[in-house]
Amino acid sequence: MGGRKRNVRKMALAVIGIAGIVLACYFLLVNFLVSAALVPSFMKRLQAFERITNEGYAAQVQTEDIQENGRAALEGTKEWLKTVQRQKVSIQSEDGFTLVAELFPRTDNHRWVILLHGYTGWKEELYPFAYWYHEEGYQVLAPDLRCQGESEGDFIGMGWTDHYDCLLWIQYILSLDEEAEIVLHGQSMGAATALMVTGEEALPSNVKAVISDCAYTDAYSMFGEKIKEWFGLPSFPFVDSACLALRLRGGYNLKDASALEAVTKSRTPTLFIHGEQDAMISVGMSRELYEAAAWQKELLIVENAGHAQSQDKDPDTYYGTIRVFLDKTLAKQE
């Protein structure tokens, strides 16, 4: 009898030990997923940036007109950068990180634009937009989002921590120009960031409009898609577990990073733009955001454009639509 009890006890301890090992391996895997997607230093060791670059290229439409227009925009931007006045500026985030931006000032009016880049991007990617806005008479602020480019950070914010940082950049502009009329123009994750900003009750009335180019509806859905695509793992239970790990390690929850929820509360006029053939963020997401938006809104779908390519596929329509939308919106609020 005593021997049987000892055997049962040994079996129970063995089961507990195996369960503990499985659980530990599971949480190691979950933490690996978080680091592989959101920690640039870890991503670099995994050569994840090369994978993301290749994925981004695959999500684009490679046609001669897009490539030609893109090259022309870059050449024009290079010439502009040789002579334009600019300066590097920085602020501190609420959690103590130094955030860096490039400022392109003007002195002839109070119109401003904040340019917000995408996932694993940097401010220089949006300099062609800075060139266009500056020529249109806007003062331009182009930040590196946290943990990217020259800005410090521990985790990529997927728009959530970034939108709090953007609120600080807005306050920075207001410290320079109390009468500033501010436009937020974001691409991809930067667009989702801009939309999340407008969902804040404390948003200063100086923020007059948003240009949302190829935004996703929410980071939770995007993370689930990428886990499946990159690692062949199902969303459940890994995404929820990753949310818990990120909350413990990074201080935020992916479920909070919802542009879709923000637009239902927004009182900021918004122009939604998306490439019809975007293979990275479905055009359906911008349509969903547009339908959910509760305030003045417009939607531009650019045919035969891939991810973040609308401006190169049809620059006249892209920038012309933005110009008309902003002139109308800003004039209405003056």
Predicted feature residues:
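Short alpha-helix in the alpha/beta-hydrolase fold that links the catalytic acid
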Residues: 259, 268, 282-291
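An N-terminal hydrophobic leader/cap segment in hydrolases
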Residues: 24-92
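Catalytic histidine-centered segment of alpha/beta-hydrolase-like enzymes
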Residues: 305-319
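The serine-hydrolase catalytic nucleophile loop
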Residues: 119-132, 145
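Conserved alpha/beta-hydrolase
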Residues: 132-152
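Short beta-strand/loop motif that positions the catalytic acidic residue
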Residues: 265-267, 272-274, 278
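Hydrolase active-site cap/lid region
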Residues: 196-253, 301
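Alpha/beta-hydrolase active-site loop
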Residues: 125, 156-177
